Curated annotation (Swiss-Prot):
Optimum pH is 6-6.5. This is Pyridoxal 5'-phosphate synthase subunit PdxS. GO terms for molecular function: amine-lyase activity; identical protein binding; pyridoxal 5'-phosphate synthase (glutamine hydrolysing) activity. It comes from Bacillus subtilis (strain 168). The gene is pdxS. The active site is at residue 81. Induction: By superoxide. It comes from the Bacteria. CDD domains: pdxS.
């Protein structure tokens, strides 16, 4: 039987990242820039989402050499992505000793029917969600941390805003319901009934929910924090900008001081050009990464 980390320990590890910024990096140099800027963790991968989107084809787990290079370069936690449903990619990353695994829609799904049973792993998992149904299904499978799916690699915050608002609105609805209404709501959402009961009792999700997918500026990061995010993932936004080190520090500061508008104004000055954005309506249905997973 596989050894498993306890739910409390894995969720506690995710709670420790609360209020922070997690940055995508593709090598040791970028990882050091992220750490020096104040990132609470880094996500090691071969290509940032914008490049994955541009290249097309099948996107897989990163070469273990890249993941190890990043792990050896920094003292902060290191995450890595596995394809949805790819048991062996996840086991390989766990064996390598990564701190978290992201079962990610940014990569090409390996299984179109089943997500990983994340309860069987010692390593904590982060998963994307667009609504409370997706959020609770991932938690039931063992996710210790959630993030909005947004629309990765676009530099467009609109989908992350939509997903964060939707999850939070649905949580408020569940909290306001009487217990005898919850079973029907569970059916409508495709959500485990016991988890909805817990959300009603606690008044919140049982795990942290970060913003991700389209964060490109300090103001974007601050916006997501104001909407109730527990922290921020930045994928392409930093290392696709003109001045990655400056952008990274500015996004960390804006995430921490998300209601200090004068500071955010100062942080936003002379940053250089942000990453080139993509209008969501211009994406074909098969190009929408957020549609992956169920």
């Amino acid at each position: 039987m596989a050894q498993t980390g306890t739910e409390r320990v894995k969720r506690g590890m995710a709670e420790m990242q609360k209020g922070g910024v997690i940055m995508d990096v593709i090598n040791a140099e970028q990882a050091k820039i992220a750490e020096e800027a104040g990132a609470v963790a880094v996500m090691a991968l071969e290509r940032v989402p914008a490049d994955i989107r541009a290249a097309g084809g099948v996107a897989r787990m990163a070469d273990p050499t890249i993941v190890e290079e990043v792990m050896n370069a920094v003292s902060i936690p290191v995450m890595a992505k596995a394809r949805i449903g790819h048991i062996v990619e996840a086991r390989v990353l766990e064996a390598m000793g990564v701190d978290y695994i992201d079962e990610s829609e940014v990569l090409t799904p390996a299984d179109e029917e089943f997500h990983l049973n994340k309860n069987e792993y010692t390593v904590p998992f982060v998963c994307g969600c667009r609504d409370l149904g997706e959020a609770t299904r991932r938690i039931a499978e063992g996710a210790s941390m959630l993030r909005t799916k947004g629309e990765p690699g676009t530099g467009n915050i609109v989908e992350a805003v939509r997903h964060m608002r939707k999850v939070n609105a649905q949580v408020r609805k569940v909290v306001a319901m009487s217990e005898d209404e919850l079973m029907t709501e569970a059916k409508n959402l495709g959500a485990p009934y016991e988890l909805l009961l817990q959300i009603k009792k606690d008044g919140k999700l049982p795990v942290v929910n970060f913003a991700a997918g389209g964060v490109a500026t300090p103001a974007d990061a601050a916006l997501m924090m104001q909407l109730g995010a527990d922290g921020v993932f930045v994928g392409s936004g930093i290392f696709k900008s003109d001045n990655p080190a400056k952008f990274a520090k500015a996004i960390v500061e804006a995430t921490t001081h998300f209601t200090d508008y004068k500071l955010i104004a100062e942080l936003s000055k002379e940053l250089g050009t942000a990453m080139k954005g993509i209008e969501i309506s211009n994406l074909l249905p098969e190009q929408r990464m957020q549609e992956r997973g169920w």
